[in-house]
Amino acid sequence: MSSGCSCGSGCKCGDNCSCSMYPDMETNTTVTMIEGVAPLKMYSEGSEKSFGAEGGNGCKCGSNCKCDPCNC
């Protein structure tokens, strides 16, 4: 059911690649980074692997500026 899925401006997937009604509308998010002194974590937990730049569901823009994969 990925026929309605398309990438927005800048070849970025629409609203978390959920085939939004307006794929060209981008959502701006403010992130606050708190830096401090902590031991370096040298292992990876399963929950951290799902976090990504496109909302954490592994969606990215593939060939011809189409969402790949698009989990609609």
Swiss-Prot record:
One MF term from GO for this chain?
Answer: metal ion binding
- Keywords of this entry: Metal-binding, Metal-thiolate cluster
Sum up the protein's function in the record's words.
Answer: Metallothioneins have a high content of cysteine residues that bind various heavy metals.
Q: What's the family?
A: Belongs to the metallothionein superfamily. Type 15 family.
Its protein name is Metallothionein-like protein 1
